[in-house]
Amino acid sequence: MTRVIVEAVVKPSEDKDKVINAIRNFFDFDKIREEEHGMEKLLIAESNSLTSLLKLHRLLREQRILDAARKYLMKSIVGSRITFMLNKQVAAIGKLSFIDKEHESPLGPIKVTIDYKDPVIVVDWLTPKTAKGVPLWENAIPPEE
C-alpha cells in the first residue's frame, strides 16, 4: 500500500501554523494530527497517494537539484521505504535542502517516509537521471497500489 508520512516537531519557540505551512510547501496531505511530547508537539501529516508529492516533484525541477536529490533519495531506500529529512527552516521559505543529521536543522528536521512496493520507481519519477541538467526522461506518476 502506498503511504507518505511527513513528521515535524514544533518547538516551544515556533509557531505551529508556520511549521504546517513549511510542510504544505512541498506536500499535500490528506490528514494531519498532533501529538504532545512535553513542551513540544509532533505534527504527523499523512497521505495514501503519491499525488501528495506533486509539489516536491515540481520544486526539484524548479530548483534544478535533480542530480543531487536523486543520489540522496537512492541512498535513502531500505526495502520498500524511502526515508529522508529536509531542513525545516529552508522548507518554510519554499526551498528544499536535504540533510543527513537532525542537528543540521537547528529547529529540527522535517522527516519524510514514503512506502511503495518498488521505491526505485518513485525515485525515477521524482528525480530522473539528467544529462547537463536536463532530465533524460519524465515518467508518469507511479500507479497507486
UniProtKB/Swiss-Prot annotation:
InterPro entries: PAB1135-like, Ribosomal_uL5_dom_sf. Gene3D superfamilies: 3.30.1440.10. SUPFAM superfamilies: RL5-like. Belongs to the UPF0201 family. NCBIfam families: PRK00447.1. PANTHER family: UPF0201 PROTEIN TK1335 (PTHR39652:SF1). This is UPF0201 protein Saci_1285. It comes from Sulfolobus acidocaldarius (strain ATCC 33909 / DSM 639 / JCM 8929 / NBRC 15157 / NCIMB 11770).
